């Protein structure tokens, strides 16, 4: 009919049910009462337990008009049915999670999906979900309460984008370094809030723009490989900083001691620069140096006080050789 438009809506089951007042059952439109809601939930819960995601479809006939339809039009809909589809985890998910755990990384699941679907997926990939927390249960919690809950909970389900962002922010506040991986529009706020936002090349544009790293490989094992390489690079970088700082401190200490006892300066500024240049050449091999296994398996943090202790201890030791040389001069 040219004077009538059919509005078709699809989305998460709970969201669609909230705007439906009728349901098409056995070819007839009947009221969506409590009894019918229980029947719908019973069927969809069975599908969710099998790991199937459910998308509800609803319709409504409206008088034809010009222009776009608004959110207010999405009311008094007729529930036509639902579509169940399987979105299995990647084959590399289970070994990647196992490898990350072995590297001291705690994995948490923050999803907008049903808690039944999420729990099924966690079971398939070997992740112990424990007690599931859903989004509606965290809205009334204070930041301190949610921070405590977030640290001991593995699986959060039925989350909104703001829920995800809040959890990530609170985990950071508690001193954790947080990496968040997502590929959808709903993941963008959490990707921005995380220390490291990770997405994939097939993600929506807004997720790729919000991410710090985009994975081009299909295998999730690249995450563990990236962690190992990052820790190796960080360890070797610390070696360079410690060696350079202690060397420079030792040189300055040597000059100060010499100026107190010798009538001349044993090392001019040019000598120090040449010495540092030669020293830097010897440090070219540091990026390729081996790193102890315990340093790779355990996350490390930047600790300035440790650098200070190293510099104060090894700097004067190197100065001993300088001072002995000055005495011979």
Where are the regions that the model predicts?
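Membrane-embedded transport module
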Residues: 129-180, 194-329
């Amino acid at each position: 009919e040219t004077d009538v438009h059919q509005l078709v809506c699809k989305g998460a089951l709970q969201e669609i049910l909230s705007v439906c007042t009728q349901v098409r059952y056995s070819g007839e439109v009947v009221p969506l009462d409590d009894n019918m809601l229980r029947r719908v939930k019973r069927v969809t819960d069975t599908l969710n337990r099998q790991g199937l995601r459910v998308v509800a479809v609803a319709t409504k006939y409206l008088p034809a008009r010009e222009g776009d339809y608004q959110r207010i039009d999405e009311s008094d809909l007729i529930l036509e049915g639902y579509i169940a589809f399987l979105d299995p985890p990647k084959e590399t998910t289970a070994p990647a999670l196992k490898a990350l755990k072995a590297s001291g990384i705690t994995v948490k699941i923050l999803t907008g999906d049903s808690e039944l679907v999420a729990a099924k997926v966690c079971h398939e990939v070997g992740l112990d979900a424990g007690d599931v927390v859903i989004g509606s249960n965290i809205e009334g919690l204070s930041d301190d309460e949610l921070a405590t809950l977030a640290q001991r909970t593995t699986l959060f389900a039925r989350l909104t984008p703001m829920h995800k962002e809040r959890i990530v922010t609170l985990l950071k506040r508690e001193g954790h370094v947080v990496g968040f991986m997502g590929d959808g529009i709903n993941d963008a706020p959490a990707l921005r809030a995380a220390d490291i936002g990770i997405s994939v090349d097939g993600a929506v544009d807004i997720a790729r723009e919000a991410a710090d790293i985009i994975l081009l490989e299909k295998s999730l094992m690249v995450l563990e490989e990236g962690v190992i390489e990052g820790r190796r690079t960080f360890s070797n970088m610390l070696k360079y900083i410690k060696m350079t700082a202690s060397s420079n401190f030792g040189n300055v200490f040597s000059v100060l001691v010499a100026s107190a006892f010798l009538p001349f300066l044993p090392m001019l500024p040019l000598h120090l620069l040449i010495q540092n240049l030669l020293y830097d050449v010897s440090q070219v091999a540091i990026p390729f140096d081996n790193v102890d296994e315990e340093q790779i398996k355990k996350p490390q943090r930047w600790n300035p006080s440790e650098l200070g202790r190293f510099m104060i201890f090894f700097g004067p030791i190197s100065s001993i050789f300088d001072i002995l040389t000055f005495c011979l001069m």
